[in-house]
């Protein structure tokens, strides 16, 4: 057994013993998030942006838009694409190069949470049906990784979309020309999906796992919900099995915690407009 494995084993035993006593390594309750700070509109050249600090985890999201063609199978819908970049400076486990499995999973779950909740109304992003639509790029940069990137990215992405202002577009049916105006308008964001992630350590579930907790967890479960009572994404990761009662508890808790986080997001958006 290597020294790293010995240290990991000691850390796991310590965390599990604390959990059995009703404590966490950073003194939070099992359902408590670390402090959440949200600042929007901080990238001048982006159409929308948000910096989210979840404890020491930091994520920056920028929104850019352009006009393009719709996908052939969805001619009456705009296009949304999500990309996650794990900056090597954020963690010694991040390496330069194309997106790895972690980045791909983070992007897919974030995209699914927004898309399946219909948070961004893609139908309202159509300029000319079947020909010209608005294309939205959600670009995520992880600046510091101290656990629970899934929630930090999801929160930052929806905050950046809410912050976005894009040029108005007019289509002249007679000439077939599209004019991009100087006047700007918000994106058609109609719901606020929020992911809530649980780590299973031993037989105990904790919300918003820190990096230390992630290193020893047996499984991970993310539940994304919106304010209408819908679940738009569920993602299980890191192996491990979840009992039905654990999943039901996670769903119930996810709705409750998402409501709290949604208020923080809306307060940040309101503050930016003052």
Curated annotation (Swiss-Prot):
Keywords: Cytoplasm, Exosome. The keyword Transcription does not apply. CDD domains: RNase_PH_archRRP42 (cd11365). One of its GO terms (biological process) is rRNA catabolic process. The keyword Zinc does not apply. Transmembrane segments: none annotated. Its main location: cytoplasm. It holds the Pfam family RNase_PH_C. Signal peptide: none annotated. One of its GO terms (molecular function) is mRNA 3'-UTR AU-rich region binding. Belongs to the RNase PH family. Rrp42 subfamily. Component of the archaeal exosome complex. Forms a hexameric ring-like arrangement composed of 3 Rrp41-Rrp42 heterodimers. The hexameric ring associates with a trimer of Rrp4 and/or Csl4 subunits. NCBIfam families: PRK04282.1-1 (NF003282). Non-catalytic component of the exosome, which is a complex involved in RNA degradation. Contributes to the structuring of the Rrp41 active site. This is Exosome complex component Rrp42.
